[in-house]
Amino acid sequence: MLIGLFPELDAPGGVQRAGRHLAAVLTEFAGSRGLECRILSLNDKAELKRLNVTGRDIVFTGSERAKGNFLAAALKTARRAAAKGKKAPKLVVAGHPNLAPVVRAMRLITPRLKTIVCTHGVEVWQPLPRVRRNALQKADLVLAPSRYTAEHVSADQGVDSGKVRVLPWALDPQFEALAVHAAKSALPARFPQGQVVLTVGRWRADERYKGMDTLITALPRLLPRWPELQLVAVGDGDDRAWLEDLAEETGVDRHVHFLSGLSYAELAACYGHCEFFALPSRGEGFGLVYLEAMACGKPVIGGAHGGAPEVIEDGKTGYVVPHGDAAQLATAMETLLDDATLRAEMGRRGKQRVENEFKFSVFAKSFRRMLRELCES
């Protein structure tokens, strides 16, 4: 029996998208071996739900943020797995380290249960609370989307490095299909005219590490040469008003545009019509938005921190700059704005890199190999 535990599946966000990809491969792997598969979600609605992910249907049950109900469902599923017999494969995949204690409790009921816990980035760059850290250490495998995060899993969480594996997240296949025609797709009505720099994220006060404020403060260095330059920020959050005030104080409010509530096709069109993408963050464990921009053939500017330098090849597919350094960010932006040939070449290299290393098929093959390894051990 294969079991998947996830914080949330039917919602936007990088953690949610990675969870859907994990659940899709887990479901497909179980089906290929004639095994029962049960998927549980903490935050989704308390109902049986079906989602089509990468052409595969995943069926899961939510707990509507009721932690007690989620734990009870997980333990009930563990008892069901225990009843399958000694020889039947039993494996649970947790899509976030916060769920590691639940996995540990399930293993007390089903000692033969193999366990995988997935990490994402900033949440494991500092020591976790003791209970979570101890539970993470007991997992058979701990997955990280970048070498940087994998190193923190060992150094800060005390997980044996032999149990830590790097599994980069993948470009969503639905977005991959949209990226093919992104440059010709219809734009949202509020997308501005002129040369556009695009950024995408959640603009929350507790996530100012994304670097949106630095993008705003870099604009005055660029506008004298490119007076029609526009910064489009896709996404929303409780920090949007603060960022809008910052743009006004900086004197660039006419050049900063927030777009939210876009469809996937409209998002792809935004990528397709920008000059380049920029998110100078210091807290990306991987950075799925970088993959989306690269898939649309666009150069990328990211932060020289976290997992971003493992996605962006500095000087080849874009640039990485220190977080908070508006001068270095402006220099990288100037270099790209100055040279259309360079933008095209970097975009071509980035698109090829996604094709070779970050397609869903590459992710699925690697994850299936890990599942097979544990099921057969």
Walk through the language-model features, giving the residues of each:
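Short alpha-helical donor nucleotide-sugar binding micro-motif in glycosyltransferases
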Residues: L136, G261-L262, A269-C274
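Carbohydrate-associated surface elements
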Residues: Y148, A170
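Conserved donor-binding/catalytic core segment of Leloir-type glycosyltransferases
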Residues: R190-K210, I216-L219
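Nucleotide-activated donor-binding/catalytic signature segment of Leloir-type glycosyltransferases, i.e.
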Residues: A241-L262
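Aromatic "clamp/platform" in nucleotide-sugar-dependent glycosyltransferases that forms part
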Residues: R282
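Short hydrophobic beta-strand element within catalytic cores of glycosyltransferases
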Residues: P299-G302, I312
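Conserved acidic donor-binding segment of nucleotide-sugar-dependent glycosyltransferases
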Residues: D314-G315, Y319-A326, T335-T341
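A short, well-ordered alpha-helix in the C-terminal region of glycosyltransferases
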Residues: Q328, T335, L342-N356, F363-S366
